[in-house]
Amino acid sequence: MQDKLNQIKELALVEIKKAKDSTTIDTIRVKYLGKKGELTTILRGMGSLSKEERPIVGKLANEVREVLEAELEAVTKAVKEAEKQEKLKNEVIDISMPGKKQTIGKKHPLEQTLDEMKKIFVSMGFAIEDGPEVEKDYYNFEALNIPKNHPARSEQDTFYINDNIVLRTQTSPVQARVMEKQQPPIKMISPGKVFRSDAVDATHSPIFYQMEGLVIDKDITFADLKGTLELFAKKMFGDKVKTKFRPHHFPFTEPSAEMDATCFVCNGKGCKVCKGEGWIEILGCGMVHPQVLRNCGIDPEVYSGFAFGFGVDRMVMLKYGIDDIRLLYESDMRFLNQF
């Protein structure tokens, strides 16, 4: 058996010295030192040896193992270094090559328009309020005078998380939350993302931006609403812009109206953007419904107020003559670099 061990040692050393890559070295290691390797097999057969032979063979076997492991380690180190140098040789970096130009970002047109609108309202004394996008059904509907089974709910295809939790369909819930925790006077705007289960096309998106406003105090009238929104329109679109109000219906305001402005592309003469009418619908508005005030803990006999709401995406599309809302969400730098 001692001769067999010496023979294994000599054969293994020859193979190790011939090894030129890591794969060959691993194969040799398994062949001689693995669980089913030749040296391991001999060690398992030591039980058949006499008591006198066992210590001699055991000592020799351990010596052979140590020699082979040391040689394998040395060759492995040399081979890995050679492989590293070969890899570096084949992956030479040409430092004279021009670098890749980094794309420089800029403010998205939606963000630009939001900032402009917020700046105008803040200059008029409005505070900016925020609220959850995942909202309770109560704040999104019932607090705003839209009870269950109200026909207005069918107009808003809603994403329901469960029976009582929705993705907000408007930023009006922020107003309800503010009225609950704060007594008048209240003067606020609530910009943010809203969600509706609309099929995506040129004018509809399941995610878009709104900005809604609310003013509550004693003796607030429709004249205050008109004055506020007309001033906003002049600051947003220029002093020459004209506005008009048309009667409308919203469940959370009474009376309700929609405000139109003279087309800022053709100055009211009629064009493709305004469909030849000279006017563009800008927003919905109205006096806060007394029931909404009651729902939020405010006495409608003492206080009154007005509310309004913009579709920010629509404002951007109208302002820049964009005819497809999908362009605002595709992150195409060829489009965004125009703003």
From Swiss-Prot:
Compartments (UniProt record): Cytoplasm
Positions that bind Mg(2+): E254
Reaction catalysed by this enzyme: tRNA(Phe) + L-phenylalanine + ATP = L-phenylalanyl-tRNA(Phe) + AMP + diphosphate + H(+)
Names of the cofactor(s): Mg(2+)
GO cellular component term, pick one: cytoplasm
SUPFAM superfamilies cross-referenced by the UniProt entry: Class II aaRS and biotin synthetases, tRNA-binding arm
Predominant cellular place of this UniProt entry's protein: cytoplasm
Gene Ontology BP annotations: phenylalanyl-tRNA aminoacylation
Keyword Acetylation among UniProt keywords: no
Subunit structure: Tetramer of two alpha and two beta subunits.
Name listed for the protein in its UniProt record: Phenylalanine--tRNA ligase alpha subunit
Upper classification of the organism: Bacteria, Bacillati, Bacillota, Clostridia, Eubacteriales
